[in-house]
Amino acid sequence: MYRRIIKPILFSLTIERAHHVALLLLRIIGLIPGGRWFLRKCYTVRHPALEREVFGVKFANPVGLAAGFDHNGEAYRELAALGFGFIEIGTVTPRPQAGNPRPRVFRLPKDRAIINRIGLSNRGLDKTICHLRRPHEGLIVGCNIGKNTVTPPENAAADYLRLFRNLYQYADYFTVNISCDNSCREGTTYTRTHILQILDPLFDFRRGQNQYRPIMLKVSPDMSDEVIDEISDILLETPLDGIVATNGPMAPDKIGRGRLSGAPLTQRAVEVVRRIHTRSGGNFPIIGVGGIMSPADAKAMLDAGADLLQLYTGYIYEGPGLVGEICRSLIADAEAAAAAKAAAEAKAREEIRAAAESEEAAKTAAATQTGIQAPETEKAAPGTETAATAQTQAAAPAESVPNPSPETQNSPARPADNEPDTRKKQPAS
C-alpha cells in the first residue's frame, strides 16, 4: 500500500513538506481511539528470536528509528506502533533553532539517497519535555542531544549537561551527537580531550542518580580510522556504554552542501561498525545506522558487529513495511540457524552412537574368536599328533621292565587271587 499509493503522493511533495504531512497523519491516527492498536496490528512483528537486551535495556526487536525523523518527540508513540523496537528523537538542543533556509532537504531517487542540510532544526528542550511527558510505558525512547549552533565549542559541555539533566527522567538512553551539524561544509574534528570534556560531566551527574541511563556516542563516517580507533579506546577507559555508527558523511561539492544518507552510505557504515567492533573486542554495544535499505543490508550490519539497527532513509524510500521485512528475515535466519544447530547435534550424537556400536561389535568379535580358539589348542583331533607331541614321546625314556627268570618263563601263569583256577590238574605219577 505504501509503495503503490502513499509513496507516490508523498514524493510529489517536497521532502520536508511530505515529512510534516506524514507526522501530522500519524498524530491524527494516534488521537483516534484504537488508532495505535490498529497500526500495531498491521505492522508489528513479535517473536522471541527478535528480543534483545542491550546495555541493560530490553528491546522487543532490534530495529529502531534513527534521530532526525521526529525532531521534537511529537509522534514517537505512533511511530513505535509501526513496528519499531525503539525510537530515537532529536537532535534536541537547549534552545529552539530554526536551522538553515529552505530548501534544505533533497531526494536523490536514482541513488536512493537524501541530502540534508536542515541544521538541527528543533523546538528546543522545553517543548520536547512536554511531548515526552505523555504516557509511553513499554516504549523504548532514546534522546539524541546536541549543542546549539551558536554555542562555541569551548562551551559545548554546558549545553550537553543541561539537556542530559533535564531529560534524564524521560528518556531510556541518550545519544551524544558530536558530529558537526549539517550546516557546515566539513565535519569538525573532535579530539579525545574535547570528547571527554563533554562526556565527563554527564558521567558525574549519572553517578548521583538512582536510575541508570546508558550514554551512547554518535560518530561520523567522515572521521579517519585513527580518530575512530581513539573513540573506540574511550569505550574501554570510561563509563561510556556504546557507539552509534554512523551519522551521514558530508556530501561531495558536486551534489550540494549537506549530509548524505541512504544507499551510498551502506558500505562505509558497515566498515566503521566492523572496525569499532574489532577494536573494542566485541564487548560494547553498537547501534548500526546508515544505508540500511533492505533485510540484506540489515544482516550485513549485524554480521559486522552491530547489536541494534536504526533506519532513516530506508524508511522513507521503502515505508514502514521495511521494519517487518527485516524482522521476518531475522526470524527466518534464527530458525535456520537453530535447525542447522539441531541437525549438527543430531549428527554428532549419531556418530558417537555408531562409534560406540562399532567398538562394542569389535570387542564381541574378539571375545568370540578367543573362545573358539582356546579348546582347539588344548585337544588335538583324533588320530593325529602334533610334531611337538611326537618329539616329546620320542624323547621320553623307556620304562625299565625286569627280565623274567627261566622259571617264571616256563611256569604257567598264576591266576589272580579272586579268580577261580581253571587249569587242569595233572594226575600224580
Segments from the language model and where they lie:
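Catalytic cores of alpha/beta
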Residues: E74-L79, M223-L235, I292-L309
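A gly/proline- and charged-residue-enriched helix-loop-helix capping module
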Residues: G90-L139
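Active-site glycine- and acidic-residue-rich loops that bind
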Residues: N148-Y160, T188, L217-L236
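Alpha-helix-loop-beta-strand connector modules within alpha/beta enzyme cores
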Residues: A113, R123-G138, T191-Y212, L260-F284, ...
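Glycine-rich phosphate-binding active-site loops on the catalytic face of alpha/beta enzymes
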Residues: E88-P94, I178-C180, V244-P249, A298-E325
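Short beta-strand/loop segments at the ligand-binding rim of alpha/beta enzyme cores
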Residues: K58-G64, G138-C143, G208-M223, R279-G288
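Glycine/Thr-rich beta-alpha phosphate-binding loop at enzyme active sites
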Residues: R36-V45, D181-H194, I228-G282
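C-terminal helical cap(s) of enzyme catalytic domains, especially alpha/beta-barrels
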Residues: G99-R112, P252-G262, Y315-A339
